[in-house]
Swiss-Prot record:
Protein name according to UniProt: Protein sll1483
InterPro entries: Adhesion/Biosynth-related, FAS1_dom_sf, FAS1_domain
Gene Ontology CC annotations of this record: outer membrane-bounded periplasmic space
Top-level lineage group: Bacteria
SUPFAM superfamilies to which the protein is assigned, alphabetical: FAS1 domain (SSF82153)
PROSITE patterns: FAS1
Span of domain FAS1: 45-176
Keywords (A to Z) from UniProt: Signal
PANTHER family: FI19380P1, PERIOSTIN-RELATED
Signal peptide: 1-26
Length: 180
């Protein structure tokens, strides 16, 4: 029952966020796919969750998505744009943070953090320009594009445009935390 409620809430947030302004088109250099992504299966027939699960670099993210019961929602049709922190990004959080977030009593907080990394629609690196866009958590993400590099809040996109059947993944070097 809780999973169904989460899916309904997730769908409602998606609908709400789709009504918000989206990132406009702009020219920018596309970041070359790095070794981080070359390990992933980038078959566009796979969902965002399947692509992430197929890459050890995202094992902490995948564990968090499972703990938050977001696998089904992020495997839905979408499309979604996911800013995916690497294992190193999670490891840079203060000691004990990840372990604490994975506890059942912190599930709502984990859902908010994870949905803060997701934007409705498929936004490629070439479409990003400086400005704000609403995340599925209902909070705005701030984008800055400078010298062909994209920053999302304080995180840097280190690999862009990893295609999936239900959207696109951009790999980031930090976990971005929503206002709590």
């Amino acid at each position: 029952m809780k999973t169904a409620a989460r899916i309904v809430a997730f769908t409602a947030l998606t609908g709400f966020a789709l009504g918000m302004p989206t990132v406009a088109m702009a020219e920018m250099e596309t970041t070359e796919k790095s070794a981080v992504v070359s390990q992933a299966a980038t078959d566009s027939a796979m969902t965002i969750v399947e692509v992430a699960a197929g890459n050890e670099t995202f094992s902490t993210l995948v564990a968090a998505v499972k703990a938050a019961d977001l696998v089904e929602a992020l495997s839905a049709e979408g499309p979604f744009t996911v800013f995916a922190p690497t294992n190193d990004a999670f490891a840079a959080l203060p000691a004990g943070t990840v372990e604490s977030l994975l506890l059942p009593e912190n599930k709502d907080k984990l859902v908010k953090i994870l949905t803060y990394h997701v934007v409705p629609g498929k936004i490629t690196a070439a479409q990003v320009q400086s400005g704000e866009v609403a995340s599925l958590a209902g909070e705005a993400l701030t984008f800055k594009v400078k010298d062909g590099k994209v920053k999302v809040n304080k995180a840097t996109v280190i690999s862009a445009d990893v295609d999936a059947s239900n959207g696109v993944i951009h790999v980031i070097d930090q976990v971005i935390l929503p206002p709590m």
